[in-house]
Amino acid sequence: EYGLYVIGETNLETHGTWQKLGADGSDEWTLPGARPEWRENVLARTDAMLERDKNHPAILIWSCGNESHGGKTLWEMSEYFRNTDPSRLVHYEGIFWNREYPATSDMESQMYTPVADIKKFLAEHPEKPFIMCEYSHAMGNSCGGITDYTEYAYEEPLYQGGFIWEYMDHGIAVTSPDGKPGFAYGGDFGDRPTDREFCVDGLVLPDRRNTPKMDAVKAAYAPLKITLTDTEAVIENRNLFTDLNAYDLVFASSVNGKPERRAVLRADCKPGGTEHIPFPFALPEAGLACMTVTAIQRAALPGIPAGYEAALGQVWHNYAVARLTLPAPQLVEMDCNVGVKGEGFEYIFGRGKGLVSIRYNGVQLLDDTVRPNFWRAPTNNDEGCAEPFTFAFWKTAGLYARCDNLSAETKGDFVIARANYTLPDGQTLPIDFAIDGAGRCDITMTWQGTRTELPEFGLLFPLRRELTEVSYLGLGPRE
């Protein structure tokens, strides 16, 4: 009724035996492995699940379990599925770690493999289709890179998609001492040792309220891909059975976040097809101009009300900051500093520090030196992988980056100041500041290092405390 494809997985997980004390894959401890004393118990679970669920048409595939390594017993499970119900395929991820019985699974399956490594694996192992039985761990601030995986499913026929771990947070409803409702997890009850928030790893909260992660998933899983140029919407119908005419296509323009014009169109496009639809009106050439196209469900479906926004596409143009035809600002070179001056503004670069001052209309904007930054607050997933320890170098790399060389020159309508930074491990980072006659500054950072696992890549601008107001267009009310 809801159009879900399901893998029915046996209630079997023994990752504590093959990850004993962090040592993966030791047959000495692995269960069930090939131990005869576990065979009857494991096959009983297999039979119980199959008999319970065999008449559910949503189940396309049976799974032997999760994170239980490999061995003969798991292969016998897979054969039981095939012999009892030959209409369905069999899945098991553990054969990636233990190739002793590769026929256990009818498909290749892995967890949390980067897309680049999936491509490499499929180039070397094209014999079976491939799924990611877990590809995004939805704990804390996460799910930011899922489109790398979902888009690859449309590029590579062997790559059949994957599963997010997991749907919901597992927390216990509690009331705090000050009377506020909330959710508790491991460690909140004095339990030691504890896995803390490791079961709070879902797309929705324990009471099923959505999180911003669900918005990211909705966009990645949208039945339509809407790409906008300056003059038209290119709509790829990714539905398997539904025509594009099941949606109202709403074209809406805005300037600086304020609505301007709106039109509703309909178009025909068969499943799997692509339609090019010209804009019904031009994008305004003023301010921060945006064209948004949304696909709105016309008729209610099971679980989907009429009026539901199924997909969205946007294109932006910032006409508010279109370059003025002004001469380059004045470049002033001194022994210790380099200045860039124009009408109402000035920048000062310290030869051993980088950008130290920005003044607009006589007001100093900076409270300290602008510096590169490679660190951010660790997420729950970072902490689960011990990445704060692994990547701690990057915190000090930004704090103690050294500006070894500063050069400046006038090029056309710009003054370009280049600050060359050296990081504590000897890697270099050039940063170019291109300043025009209106005081606008375009910044280009070029990473030249060999290390690629940067937690963040950007600049910190310490602003004066009296600068208390900021105006911006963000990613929406839920971000």
Set out the residue ranges of the language-model regions.
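Extracellular ectodomain segments of secreted/surface proteins
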Residues: K218-T231, Q314-Q330
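Beta-strand-rich binding/interaction modules
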Residues: E232-A267, E275-P280, G287-R298
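Short beta-strand elements of extracellular/lumenal beta-sandwich folds
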Residues: D230-N239, D442-Q448
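Extended substrate-binding grooves/exosites of carbohydrate-active enzymes
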Residues: E1-T231, N239-N245, V250-P259
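Solvent-exposed strand-loop boundary residues in beta-sheet-rich modules
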Residues: V255-G257, A299-L301, N361-G362, R465
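Beta-strand/loop-rich accessory regions of lumenal/periplasmic or secreted enzymes
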Residues: P280-A286, N318-E479
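Generic detection of short hydrophobic beta-strand segments and adjacent strand-loop junctions
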Residues: R262-C269, E275-F281, A310-Y319, L459-F461
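Terminal connector regions
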Residues: L283-R323
